[in-house]
């Protein structure tokens, strides 16, 4: 039987508050990530991804406290990323209740960190987040490069080869964001999603660009992703998770 495809709402959190606005009805405090995560859990989301965009070091304790609160009230897998640079960072997040930890920039600067983390904690809880941008011109063979610092700094690393290297080092999952599409609401970059999904044997989560339910379905059908991640279409109440699952099922996709 085909593995069920996952739907994963994403929360961007700064100093313990959700920052990409949330306009759910019936939420007393739109900024509290725990309340929002509970809503998604009740709606039947498969997982929650929590990206800590707090730049300051002192924000870390707030983050751990938020993760602890979330883990005590939300009973679906929780992935936490943002500023993860050391084995101790990973241990702290897992101890706070995260199920998986996402590594982004630190993997670029020190790829062996991914191998060390996978060896220490198991591949099943190590996610590598990749921010990719298309660098090939019209008529050229499509090529995507890894960027860091929120898509501002090119690394010269080929995104497909890099993802393969991360898998070889022990990553259990790739969270792939297209920097070209992020926030544009006109769909995933299906080219890079498919290229990486087809090259790897581990799950790829497609992220960046969802504006409607067809975009979610296309990420799976055309992008070959194992899971699809979205923020604003769920946060603003445009669609609910059950609506997304029903739509994907209507397109022949196996959902939980």
UniProtKB/Swiss-Prot annotation:
Residues of the active site: 12, 131
GO biological process, one term: L-histidine biosynthetic process
Keywords noted in UniProt: Amino-acid biosynthesis, Cytoplasm, Histidine biosynthesis, Lyase
Position of the signal peptide: none
Listed EC numbers: 4.3.2.10
Catalyzed reaction equations: 5-[(5-phospho-1-deoxy-D-ribulos-1-ylimino)methylamino]-1-(5-phospho-beta-D-ribosyl)imidazole-4-carboxamide + L-glutamine = D-erythro-1-(imidazol-4-yl)glycerol 3-phosphate + 5-amino-1-(5-phospho-beta-D-ribosyl)imidazole-4-carboxamide + L-glutamate + H(+)
GO MF entries: imidazoleglycerol-phosphate synthase activity; lyase activity
Entry GO terms, CC: cytoplasm
Gene3D superfamilies tied to this protein: Aldolase class I (3.20.20.70)
InterPro entries the record matches: Aldolase_TIM, His_biosynth, HisF, IGPS_HisA/HisF, RibuloseP-bd_barrel
Enzyme class: lyase
Subcellular location: Cytoplasm
Pathway of action: Amino-acid biosynthesis; L-histidine biosynthesis; L-histidine from 5-phospho-alpha-D-ribose 1-diphosphate: step 5/9
Pfam families named in the record: His_biosynth (PF00977)
Main location: cytoplasm
Family: Belongs to the HisA/HisF family.
Subunit structure: Heterodimer of HisH and HisF.
NCBIfam families in UniProt: hisF (TIGR00735)
Function recorded in the entry: IGPS catalyzes the conversion of PRFAR and glutamine to IGP, AICAR and glutamate. The HisF subunit catalyzes the cyclization activity that produces IGP and AICAR from PRFAR using the ammonia provided by the HisH subunit.
HAMAP family: HisF
Name used for this protein in its record: Imidazole glycerol phosphate synthase subunit HisF
Species of provenance: Pseudomonas savastanoi pv. phaseolicola (strain 1448A / Race 6) (Pseudomonas syringae pv. phaseolicola (strain 1448A / Race 6))
Gene this protein is translated from: hisF
């Amino acid at each position: 039987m085909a593995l069920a495809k996952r739907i994963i709402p994403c929360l961007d959190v700064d100093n313990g508050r959700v920052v990409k606005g949330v306009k759910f009805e019936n939420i007393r405090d739109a900024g509290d990530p725990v309340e929002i995560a509970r809503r998604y859990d009740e709606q039947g989301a498969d997982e929650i991804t929590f990206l800590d965009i707090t730049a300051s070091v002192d924000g870390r304790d707030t983050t751990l406290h938020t993760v602890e609160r979330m883990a005590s009230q939300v009973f679906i897998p929780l992935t936490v990323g943002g500023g993860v640079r050391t084995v101790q960072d990973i241990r702290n997040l897992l101890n706070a209740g995260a199920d998986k930890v996402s590594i982004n920039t630190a993997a670029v600067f020190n790829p062996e960190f991914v191998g060390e983390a996978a060896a220490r904690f198991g591949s099943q809880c190590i996610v590598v987040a990749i921010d990719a941008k298309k660098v090939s011109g019209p008529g050229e063979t499509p090529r995507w490069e890894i960027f860091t610092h929120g898509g501002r700094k090119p690394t010269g690393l080929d995104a497909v080869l890099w993802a393969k290297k991360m898998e070889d080092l022990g990553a259990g999952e790739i969270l792939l964001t297209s920097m070209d599409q992020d926030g544009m609401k006109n769909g995933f970059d299906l080219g890079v999603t498919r290229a990486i999904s087809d090259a790897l044997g581990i799950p790829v989560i497609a992220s960046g660009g969802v504006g409607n339910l067809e975009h979610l379905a296309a990420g799976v059908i055309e992008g070959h992703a194992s899971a699809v991640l979205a923020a604003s279409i769920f946060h603003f109440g445009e669609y609910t998770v059950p609506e997304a699952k029903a739509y994907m099922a209507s397109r022949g996709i196996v959902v939980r």
